[in-house]
């Protein structure tokens, strides 16, 4: 279930927050209008820090969440596909 869209806090934003039971995904959506490779570099270090900060703020106000991850969704409008990368910032 989508619990928030464009959630903002502490000068940071998460595109989507999706929750299923006690698990949460913080989703960064990247849209591409033409064909070509989708790069992991589309989310740079500064943006990663902002997304992480927003996720931490949200989690601070929602105790009881046992699992959380950041997911990147690459939407390619040229061929109507979506590619998901879970645990995007783990490394």
Label each region the model flagged.
Residues 1-9:
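A short acidic/basic microdomain associated with nuclease active sites
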Residues 7, 29-31, 87:
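Active-site donor-binding loop signature of nucleotide-sugar glycosyltransferases
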Residues 10-12, 78-79:
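Short acidic/glycine-enriched loop/turn segments that link adjacent beta-strands
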Residues 12, 23-25, 71, 83:
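Protein kinase-like catalytic core scaffold
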Residues 32-57, 61:
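Mg2+/Mn2+-dependent nuclease catalytic core
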Residues 61-91:
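Domain-level recognition of nuclease-like catalytic cores that cleave nucleotide substrates
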């Amino acid at each position: 279930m989508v619990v928030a869209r464009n959630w903002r806090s502490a000068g940071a934003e998460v595109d989507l927050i999706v929750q299923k039971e006690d698990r949460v995904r913080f989703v960064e959506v990247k849209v591409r209008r033409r064909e070509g490779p989708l790069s992991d570099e589309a989310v740079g270090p500064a943006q990663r820090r902002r997304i992480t900060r927003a996720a931490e703020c949200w989690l601070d106000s929602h105790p009881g969440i046992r699992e959380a991850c950041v997911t990147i969704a690459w939407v390619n409008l040229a061929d109507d596909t979506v590619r998901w990368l879970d645990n995007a910032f783990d490394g």
